[in-house]
């Protein structure tokens, strides 16, 4: 009985032990699963962190790497007239440029400062003085860049340029030689990204071809023949309403043009080998101011003769830039000097009002005298700078790489943005108001378009910007649903630039003065401007030019020339 009792008790104990073991194993298994799940979850989080960290690292060190989270940067925006010609409803923070950058890089500009083009530089002076800089901004003065570097206000961009700029962007900068990037290096450090000032070529003479046809005039082959055409416009009162005096060749009182202005008389100065308002190499190899030379004196005498003949607008001294533009757009003027892009501004507006107006460009290279070597400077270039301490200085390089390389040469999804070229949307619509391109980009684009039109090149080989212009030019040639933008694209790219390509024009080699101290003091600038206008209008004899030169040196010019010669040695 005892044994039987023990056996029963043993069986119970055995069952209890088995059950306990089973429960223990079950508990251990559950614990192991929970531990594994926790470990897997931890590993997943760590993996996500590593992935996210890797994404940030890729974004910081590559041109096209996309940020895992939106990076917002504050910006000082230079806004253009008429909302930069942006399509209705688009803004400087929400347009095709900003949306594409958001999609491609996951970045967004926040325009904390906005100012018009004509007041932007003055505004920049204020915020720099007050040390109220946005993360990114464009400045338009080399002296301002010098000041910002001296006061340690901006970031060193050397490393981010190396890693976050594409090879093509670097090649674009290289097409200008080493001087351009060297101009923004301080103690070997790259402190800004300069605009590449593309060669816009010489000024062309734009004439109303429909007026010439109406008067039975032949197209001019020389500058003097062109002035005969303008004289005929005057005698036949072309563009003048009853009681109004006809308008001759309109020109701005500054007389000398820039890469962004029309209405100069540069070709007339070039006819005499003169380089007013430019520093040039003198006969003895020293730097001289071009406005003081005998060649400039001869050109002024010729301008006076044109004024006396009524060819030059008799009221040119009273007109402002806006007034000159109004004369062209209103159809009162039939002649002025302007660069190849003139159809975009102001001629496009006149064509929209009067589609029968027919402007043609003329170029007379045979009449350009061999001039002395002139010096270029970087004083008026635009520069992109980054605020000292901003954590994403690479963002500037990435924007340049996307806008001026990827979307123009590789992207298959940037059509809407690239239509901006044909729509003549102003560059101020871009977050960074500079352009980066090859030195001879203007001529390369036209040569490629002409090859496709002639059937010597496939359209697929065109870059995005070239394709946009080609399609507009093709629309104009075919005459189907032609828009004013199509007309402007054809007149600028084919008629104007095509004229330069045909004449085998080549970008002249530039010699740079490595100094930013070239600004003419206001007193000397005013003396020069008043003297030149008075001589042209006949209020002073041409002999007064020699007296002007003496006064220029006496009133501070002598010290200025000495200083510049010292800097250039």
Predicted features and spans:
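Sec-dependent N-terminal signal peptides of Gram-positive bacterial secreted proteins and lipoproteins
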Residues: 7-31
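Short, solvent-exposed loop/beta-turn-alpha elements that line the ligand-binding surface or hinge
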Residues: 65, 156-175, 218, 276-294, ...
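Carboxylate/His-rich catalytic cores and anion/metal-binding grooves
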Residues: 142-179, 229-234, 244-278, 334-348
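Conserved small-residue motifs centered on glycine
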Residues: 58, 398, 405-530, 539
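Long, His/Glu/Asp-enriched segments that create or flank divalent metal/ion-associated functional microenvironments
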Residues: 99-102, 339, 474, 480
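Extracytoplasmic/periplasmic substrate-binding proteins
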Residues: 254-278, 304-464
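Helix-loop-helix "hinge/cap" segment bordering the ligand-binding cleft or interdomain interface
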Residues: 158, 185-260, 281-327, 332, ...
